């Protein structure tokens, strides 16, 4: 759950004074607030010199919690939202776009699964360059393993021969390094607040969010028999899907593979069965190391049959744009 301090930027009434009052009662997060006796908390607030301000803060938090209880929406409204706000974004590869009938869908969480050196990061950078160049939107790239390369991104941009235009496209891509699950939580919660405050129009709108890789952050917290790690994993998944839907963002995350057990050396996506149900779309990327050809296939999709596949081609460093 979000710490109270994350609410201050959008709600000034939840200032340091209010946070200190809550902290004195062991309340640091929204979850703590829900678990506390609110009648007792209100009674304590009335004994303070700034009782009116504290009571206003308590009322505000309750209203914020109530707003998070999403209302029921009928199918017609969902369809209208799909046609009006949820567009497709090119992945940067024609064959993949054809396979996905246009590319990534805004409002959806897409997972790209593949073994090490299969080309997942290259695919992500190519997608980032494509969205920044062709869709005139911003891209936020969360890098968990120092694999992001601005030089490689620039090579994907076909307009790079025009230095001014190339720089403008590059300026639409913002990269943050994220090394643990808690930093990812903070980053996504700050992003949620920022998106709510700003007017998302034209080039200022965030259209693609990349997390490369989500599994490197989640795997370390899944050890042992406790359920806390899985709860954090589900919470991250929920937050990503919430951002995607409410702000019409296409979200792309990468996941590695693990042994499936048994003979034959088969593999399966990491993070287990709990995570399996979270992404809207699940794609598998494999590479033939003899000729460097890549194959992308659909493991799961909301509107397309699984099992379909296509050969992909990511441009080599010395290859010119068509």
From Swiss-Prot:
One of its GO terms (cellular component) is nucleus. It holds the Pfam family Rad51. Its main location: nucleus. It is found in: Nucleus. SUPFAM superfamilies: P-loop containing nucleoside triphosphate hydrolases. Keywords: ATP-binding, DNA damage, DNA recombination, DNA repair, DNA-binding, Nucleotide-binding, Nucleus. This is DNA repair protein RAD51 homolog 4. It comes from Arabidopsis thaliana.
